[in-house]
Amino acid sequence: MASADRVTAPVDTVTTGPIEGSVKHYREVDGLRIPVRRINLTNGETFDVYDTSGPYTDENATIDLEAGLPKLRDSWDKPTVAGPRTQLAWARAGIVTPEMRFIAAREGVEPELVRAEVAAGRAVIPANHNHPELEPTIIGKKFLVKINANIGNSAVSSSIAEEVEKMVWATRWGADTIMDLSTGKNIHETREWILRNSPVPVGTVPIYQALEKVNGDPAALTWEIYRDTVIEQAEQGVDYMTVHAGVLLRYVPLTAKRVTGIVSRGGSIMAAWCLAHHRESFLYTHFEELCEILARYDVTFSLGDGLRPGSVADANDEAQFAELRTLGELTKIAKSHGVQVMIEGPGHVPMHKIVENVRLEEELCEEAPFYTLGPLATDIAPAYDHITSAIGAAIIAQAGTAMLCYVTPKEHLGLPNRDDVKTGVITYKIAAHAADLAKGHPHAQQRDDALSKARFEFRWRDQFALSLDPDTAREYHDETMPAEPAKTAHFCSMCGPKFCSMRISADVREYAEANNLTDVAAIEAGMAAKSAEFAESGGKVYLPVVS
């Protein structure tokens, strides 16, 4: 890391080492090393799962946080094409890039599908030329549903070391991208440490740092300050940027009757600027210049929903959908400049209004990937908003949303800590995987089937290893059955040895196999035997107690 980017409090250590029951493995595909988490099952089989943790779970890797991760993509081809060197431009030219081949191997699909979806604008590959450390991923509805984890300091909480650890911790448990939303001290330095050590794409909201440069006064913001901030972040390697260019002056009055007004930080900043100057947003008026900047680095637009609803009462209102129509216009402009685009969505939406959001986004924004914050399906559960939002997230992902921004238990209450980050990631991995199952994504059900088989065969350690959170699964089992023999017992503390339905089912199968019967025949034979026994006893319901 360049000395100019160093600070007096370096990051000394982060969480490393394999996840329980697994090892880091690399599959050689078409000259590329594709990372997977290989689970070694007790029956001698192995099971590979998609892995976002980078070298941090590789016990053979040497982690040097000062130097950063190996520059994986430095040696990859960057073909010459007319216009910008972006994944969108290459895809439109019919070129399958190394990033596309890498992604295809990770997803278990053909490289041509990756290229075609990127070319059509239905998928994006956030991969800044200046972030060679990342392992490429794709965001699009024909691929695995991705999740993002927000990290970042505030004016009152957290350090650089804590934020880097949050990044490593989030990717360990499955975060596909990270957003650094720092608003406190050392924003540039924090971002530099995260980028140089992040194996996944990193997103930002540049208006936050721009606001810091003018001491927190929205009215003092200028296009020049914002432009320079975007260039600064693009030079560092930021892969996608949230830009609230759809918050127009004429839309601000539409929020006046809302229960919760404008809840987006970026949206409120731009609304305040528009009202202070009574002029159209500089993000909107300078959008084409912004496109030219992002195209140089292949930074992906994440067009922000600055007027998203902050309560279920405000869901699907005119302010929200007016902004969405403008985002559709901006999507066309960005793509004409060869810049990849995804669209951000709500927010707080009751279940019966969720699918309408996806339908309109696809209609108005040319099916650009949808990236939503939840949405929260109800407003009544502070401290449990990871659950209220996961309900909405599963529904909206099944309907076609490509990436879900996680919500932690601290939502609306405070800055999430390390434990909150893990809870948010695991909760959203559940929602994303449930949607993958419902959409029939290739290979999605294989992990469910493997875990169900292990459960039926009482392979407890395999159940833990195949789960999204092996540590917690094992800890819960250990609370009541910590002894080593319990890890092969044919029951758990829920039902005990006599009432375990799976043990009884297994006994039926064993009886059937021993007597050359089908399961149904075995049950019928057992019932017949009991019937004969009842008749032999004289048909008595109550028999004498045998001491």
Swiss-Prot record:
Alphabetically ordered keywords of this record: 4Fe-4S, Iron, Iron-sulfur, Lyase, Metal-binding, S-adenosyl-L-methionine, Thiamine biosynthesis, Zinc
Gene Ontology MF terms in the entry: 4 iron, 4 sulfur cluster binding; carbon-carbon lyase activity; zinc ion binding
Note describing how the cofactor binds: Binds 1 [4Fe-4S] cluster per subunit. The cluster is coordinated with 3 cysteines and an exchangeable S-adenosyl-L-methionine.
Chain residues that bind substrate: N150, M179, Y208, H244, S264, R265, G266, D305, G306, L307, R308, E344, Y371
Superkingdom of the source species: Bacteria
Binding residue positions for Zn(2+): H348, H412
Positions bound to [4Fe-4S] cluster: C492, C495, C500
Pathway: Cofactor biosynthesis; thiamine diphosphate biosynthesis
Top-level class of the enzyme under EC nomenclature: lyase
InterPro entries registered for this protein in UniProt: ThiC, ThiC-associated_dom, ThiC/Bza_core_dom, ThiC/BzaA/B
GO terms under cellular component: cytosol
GO biological process: thiamine biosynthetic process; thiamine diphosphate biosynthetic process
EC number: 4.1.99.17
Role: Catalyzes the synthesis of the hydroxymethylpyrimidine phosphate (HMP-P) moiety of thiamine from aminoimidazole ribotide (AIR) in a radical S-adenosyl-L-methionine (SAM)-dependent reaction.
Record-stated family: Belongs to the ThiC family.
The protein's name in its UniProt record: Phosphomethylpyrimidine synthase
Organism, scientific name: Nocardia farcinica (strain IFM 10152)
Gene name of this polypeptide: thiC
